[in-house]
Amino acid sequence: MRYEKPQRGRLREHLQLNCDIFGATGRSGEIEILQLITHLMKSFGATSEHFEVLINDREIVNTVFNELMKVDEETSYKLYKIIDRAKKVSPEALDKMINELSLEESSVKILKDYLGSKSFESLFSFLDSHGKLEMVSGFKELADIASKIGLSDYLVYDPTIVRGLDYYTGIVFEVFDKNPENRRALCGGGAYANLLKIFNENPVAGVGFGLGDVTLTDF
């Protein structure tokens, strides 16, 4: 149950399927979760014409904000909120929100170049041009593995996927319906390295996703 205004794809009462992997090393857990969600969608008869998995990595976003733009923690937090809303507002509204932060002109250019990176290739080219490609080698490894095992038909890099929850530390992703009449996220998730510290002083890394029955019914 959740207390909010009922609307298409969101009801107060709903069922949610959660799948998580704990303690996996390297990128293995992330790859397995991506395989699982893709296989789950395909088991419903969906193909790459029906859905896509939009993916990003919090380490990439942090690299852009902290290493390239060199903004402070408060501004970084505001930027996360702005990018999270990027798909829901007009380009003019997005520019207005960015301008209200009074960023340096060079930082605005870096941000817009980053937001213009809409494929794995363009992202890696952007980071390489700033000498930061090695800082996201793990994400490049994930993209390479995904390509080798046949996930590349479903995975799409999207710089605006950041997920609003602060506990994500690695990949973040959302499964999107490609139907123009229901262009929305069906489910989402990501990797979190420190969340379980609230239960155990020794952190256990996790990665997973949640899928609601309401959005799945509309698919």
Each predicted region: which residue ranges?
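Short secondary-structure capping/junction motifs at helix and strand boundaries
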Residues: 45-52, 73-77
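Charged, amphipathic alpha-helical linkers/stalks
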Residues: 43, 67-68
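Beta-rich nucleic-acid/ligand-interaction surfaces
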Residues: 52-67, 161-169
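Short acidic alpha-helix initiation/capping motifs at coil-to-helix transition points
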Residues: 55-56, 86-91, 134
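Intrinsic-disorder-associated interaction segments
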Residues: 54, 69-72, 87, 100-104, ...
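Acidic, His- and aromatic-enriched active-site or binding-groove loops in soluble protein domains
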Residues: 69-98, 151, 177-179
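Positively charged, Gly/Ser-enriched RNA/tRNA-binding surfaces
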Residues: 1-47, 95-219
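A general alpha-helix detector
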Residues: 36, 60-64, 93
